[in-house]
A protein has these predicted regions:
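Hydrophobic/basic alpha-helical segments
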Residues: 1-174
Length: 174
């Protein structure tokens, strides 16, 4: 089932969604290759990548980031690796060095930052969805627990990796 551009399967695995966003991003890569052949500068190519390709890889990240496997994360990173190699014109370059050279962060770091920004905006008192995260009730005693928000009891690993418990853990770590 596709909801707002995110493919949600009944078993809450994100293989289909990852395949979908990677295919969508790869379909935009032909334009990046064509622009490189036409001789556009690296700044323009990078700008195109950021505005036309990477947006597909970051759509609704807080929903599916916590459920990614290592393989799915590597599939998404591969898209950026290909884009960087096209922009730089070097196909045998180290990915992390190329990211720093071009001024980008690896996508797994970027996804984490997007989740942190989302959770901070959502938990602010002015947000319409601030009740999504419940404050911990400590009563009258002061405790050493740093958790300000109540974490969900997760009996199964699938629920532990779902968005709400993950985002609550992120919020408590900030």
């Amino acid at each position: 089932m596709k909801i707002l551009g995110v493919i949600v399967t009944p078993n809450l695995k994100w293989d289909a969604n990852t395949d979908f966003i990677c295919k969508k991003a790869y379909s935009k890569m032909w334009a990046l290759r064509r622009m490189k052949v036409l001789g556009l500068d690296s700044f323009t190519l990078l700008d195109f990548y950021l505005k036309e390709v990477r947006v597909h890889l970051e759509l609704a990240v807080p929903v599916w980031h916590s459920g990614l496997t290592v393989k799915l994360s590597a599939d998404i990173e591969r898209v950026q690796k290909v884009a960087i190699s096209i922009i730089l014109g070097q196909y045998d370059i180290n990915y992390v060095q190329a990211c720093t050279q071009i001024g980008l962060k690896p996508l797994f770091i970027r996804r984490q930052e997007l989740c942190e920004r989302f959770v901070l905006k959502t938990s602010s008192p002015t947000s319409k969805h601030s009740d999504m995260f419940q404050l911990e009730k400590n009563g009258t005693h002061s405790t050493r627990s740093k958790n300000q928000y109540r974490e969900h009891v997760c009996l199964k690993n699938r629920f532990y990796k779902s968005p709400l418990p993950y985002l609550t853990r992120v919020l408590n770590q900030l």
